[in-house]
Amino acid sequence: MIETISAITLATHDMARAVHFYEALGFEIVHGGKDGLFTSFRAGTCYLNLIAQSVDRHWSWWGRAIFYVSDVDAFYANVIANGYRSDEAPRDAEWGERFFHLTDPDGHELSFARPLG
């Protein structure tokens, strides 16, 4: 029986740029860093990992990592204050979450959410 997700690993063409992005969002590095080939961030009780890939390696898939945050609007304000953009402001969804989406520098879609009520 599956208990939980331990980690999500995303590829990056520029580790320094990706590390800067995720640190600006408040992710804490637990391994690696801007000069590494592999970096791991704490994401609650799980981990978000980055693995460096050569620029000639391309990916053409779609997926989304969803992270629960304590305050969606405050998190969004921090994203904007750090110079990043989201296609739309946080909103309440019919499935019972407040959320917004953000795309990282390598094109990975992220969602930051919180259950309503």
What are these regions (language model features)?
Residues 23-30, 83-85:
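Conserved acetyl-CoA-binding loop of GNAT-fold acetyltransferases
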Residues 13-15, 65-109:
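Vicinal oxygen chelate
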Residues 4, 61, 96:
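Exposed loop/turn and edge beta-strand positions of beta-sandwich/beta-sheet ligand-binding modules
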Residues 1-19, 64-65, 113-117:
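N-terminal beta-strand motif that seeds the catalytic metal site of vicinal oxygen chelate
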Residues 28-62, 109-114:
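Conserved short beta-strand elements that form part of the metal-binding/catalytic scaffold
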Residues 9, 28-34, 91-93, 117:
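Conserved catalytic-core motifs of GNAT/GCN5-like acyltransferases
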